[in-house]
């Protein structure tokens, strides 16, 4: 039974990282495209746009890191496997 739980945990860890990277990846691409467009329209606002973009990219990247933490806990500190 532990081997089935271990196999499911590995699959779940892979899905956690993969799915946690899709949303922020799309969001970062969209945010960067809009920032470039905004800088092209108003070059004088480049500093404010860049600062806001970097802060929002950091928040989006945090979601991916949370997925990685879930995956690592499933792999190395799995609560479903009896030790």
Swiss-Prot record:
GO MF terms held by the record: lipid binding; proton-transporting ATP synthase activity, rotational mechanism
One short Pfam name that applies is ATP-synt_C
* Keywords associated with the record: ATP synthesis, CF(0), Chloroplast, Hydrogen ion transport, Ion transport, Lipid-binding, Membrane, Plastid, Thylakoid, Transmembrane, Transmembrane helix, Transport
* SUPFAM superfamilies assigned: F1F0 ATP synthase subunit C
According to Swiss-Prot or TrEMBL, what is its membrane topology?
Answer: Multi-pass membrane protein
Its biological purpose is as follows: F(1)F(0) ATP synthase produces ATP from ADP in the presence of a proton or sodium gradient. F-type ATPases consist of two structural domains, F(1) containing the extramembraneous catalytic core and F(0) containing the membrane proton channel, linked together by a central stalk and a peripheral stalk. During catalysis, ATP synthesis in the catalytic domain of F(1) is coupled via a rotary mechanism of the central stalk subunits to proton translocation.
Annotated Gene Ontology cellular components are: chloroplast thylakoid membrane; proton-transporting ATP synthase complex; proton-transporting two-sector ATPase complex, proton-transporting domain
Note on file?
A: In plastids the F-type ATPase is also known as CF(1)CF(0).
**Similarity-based family:** Belongs to the ATPase C chain family.
PANTHER family xrefs: ATP SYNTHASE LIPID-BINDING PROTEIN, MITOCHONDRIAL (PTHR10031), ATPASE PROTEIN 9 (PTHR10031:SF0)
What species is given as this protein's source? Galdieria sulphuraria
Q: Where is this site: Reversibly protonated during proton transport?
A: 61
Question: What protein name is recorded for this chain?
Answer: ATP synthase subunit c, chloroplastic
């Amino acid at each position: 039974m532990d081997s089935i739980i271990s196999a499911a945990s590995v699959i779940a860890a892979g899905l956690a990282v993969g799915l946690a990277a899709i949303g922020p990846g799309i969001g970062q691409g969209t945010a960067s495209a809009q920032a470039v467009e905004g800088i092209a329209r108003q070059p004088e606002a480049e500093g404010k746009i860049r600062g806001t973009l970097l802060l929002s990219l950091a928040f989006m990247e945090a979601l991916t890191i949370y997925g990685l933490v879930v995956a690592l806990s499933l792999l190395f500190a799995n609560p479903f496997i009896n030790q």
